[in-house]
Amino acid sequence: RCLECHVTYAGISSAPGVEPEEYHHDQIIFGVDCEKCHGPAADHVAFHTENTRDTMAKYIINSSSLSRQQNLDMCVLCHGGNIQKTKPSFTYTPGRSLADYFKIDTLSMVAVQNENIDVHGNQYGLLRSSKCFKQSTTMTCNTCHNPHEKERGKTAIFSQRCMSCHTPGHDNFCKLKLSLTQLSKNCIDCHMPARKSMAVAVSLPGEEVPRAAFVRSHFISIYPDETKKMIENINK
């Protein structure tokens, strides 16, 4: 499972059904590349190399042509919590139903307040239990995340995406008595606070004991303690 999420593709050398799987070291696409979300691209490249004037993308997956669940499945592959594969690694491709390749742990996607649910790797389960997701018929991971841009830490950008639904003057807008300028810069620290992961720790230079990694909770909610800290920081 580590490889399936941290590389785009690896050719399996072991026989079907044999665990642990072994891989061809010369058949690995390192990192998360285009094919992770757009599917195998050899035919796409071959066609457009020969047909340079054809601007309509052929033989490639475009997320705009997929259903909501198909779009979500691409992310659930690596952000869906404790999903167990039922078919060999790297056989799922975008556009297919993830449930045909994995047993999805739906139980962990319900009791999100349970402290045993880790923020690392279970972003879909947490998001799926949030009111924002439940009350929308179109919300996907791409509603908030642009997979083609590096946006980590840019809270103002994410906050603007929150406010595309939570608009000033509506009942679902922030009730804090702060200026619109202050509110529009950081919805994230209040409603998606960073939480310690119980699954992932990092070793820092000069420290003997690893520290828990902090990951933003994707259970979008009201966190009174985080709101209090936010107001205190603004008033400093």
Place the predicted regions along the sequence by residue.
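Primarily the internal scaffold of c-type cytochrome electron-transfer domains
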Residues: 9-236
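Parallel beta-helix/beta-solenoid
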Residues: 1-9
